[in-house]
Amino acid sequence: MSCGMSQLERSIDTIINVFHQYSVRVGPRDSLSQKEFKQLVQKELHNFLKKEARDEKAINDIMEDLDTNQDKQLSFEEFVILMARLVHASHEEMHKNAPHDHEGHSHGPGLGGGGPGHGHGHSHGHGHGHSH
């Protein structure tokens, strides 16, 4: 499926694949249990959620907030809410860190300051650190 896909399409595909990597381990196949969500946060989002990844209560609080139907599982739709929040926060951080005196639409490092090649529009698959 990855043949000829754009960078954005590959990114979407990656989010789906990572969700499926964790969602098939316990319980319903297409949802994350609390344990699966914790593993995903700690292994896949440890830079974006630095403090939360080390704090089980914080992970539980995030899951509770996302679990809109309160079934103690995160559906893909509920999980995507977290992805949207992280993308939004990273975008805001890029604008906050950007120098305000240059032209074009290249902004400084996103969450965590990734250095060259990690700015807005120049990602090469590297994450941006994030802490709340």
Swiss-Prot record:
An individual GO BP term: neutrophil aggregation
One Pfam family recorded for the sequence: S_100
Protein name, entry field: Protein S100-A9
Positions of post-translational Pros-methylhistidine modification: H107
Segments traversing the membrane: none
Sequence repeat residue numbers: 117-124, 125-132
Domain of life: Eukaryota
Job description of the protein: S100A9 is a calcium- and zinc-binding protein which plays a prominent role in the regulation of inflammatory processes and immune response. It can induce neutrophil chemotaxis, adhesion, can increase the bactericidal activity of neutrophils by promoting phagocytosis via activation of SYK, PI3K/AKT, and ERK1/2 and can induce degranulation of neutrophils by a MAPK-dependent mechanism. Predominantly found as calprotectin (S100A8/A9) which has a wide plethora of intra- and extracellular functions.
InterPro entries named among the record's database cross-references: EF-hand-dom_pair, EF_Hand_1_Ca_BS, EF_hand_dom, S100/CaBP7/8-like_CS, S100_Ca-bd_sub
Residues that bear S-nitrosocysteine: C3
Subcellular location: Secreted; Cytoplasm; Cytoplasm, Cytoskeleton; Cell membrane
Region (2 X 8 AA tandem repeats of G-H-G-H-G-H-S-H) location: 117-132
GO cellular component, as recorded: calprotectin complex; cytoplasm; cytoskeleton; extracellular exosome; nucleus; plasma membrane; S100A9 complex
Organism: Oryctolagus cuniculus
Start-end of Gly residues biased regions: 107-118
Keywords: Antimicrobial, Antioxidant, Apoptosis, Autophagy, Calcium, Cell membrane, Chemotaxis, Cytoplasm, Cytoskeleton, Immunity, Inflammatory response, Innate immunity, Membrane, Metal-binding, Methylation, Phosphoprotein, Repeat, S-nitrosylation, Secreted, Zinc
Residue positions binding Ca(2+) 1: S23, E36
Topology with respect to the bilayer: Peripheral membrane protein
Gene3D superfamilies, alphabetized: EF-hand
Entry keyword annotation includes Secreted: yes
Subunit structure, interactors included: Homodimer. Preferentially exists as a heterodimer or heterotetramer with S100A8 known as calprotectin (S100A8/A9). S100A9 interacts with ATP2A2. S100A9 interacts with AGER, and with the heterodimeric complex formed by TLR4 and LY96 in the presence of calcium and/or zinc ions. S100A9 binds quinoline-3-carboxamides in the presence of calcium and/or zinc ions. S100A9 interacts with amyloid-beta protein 40. Calprotectin (S100A8/9) interacts with CEACAM3 and tubulin filaments in a calcium-dependent manner.
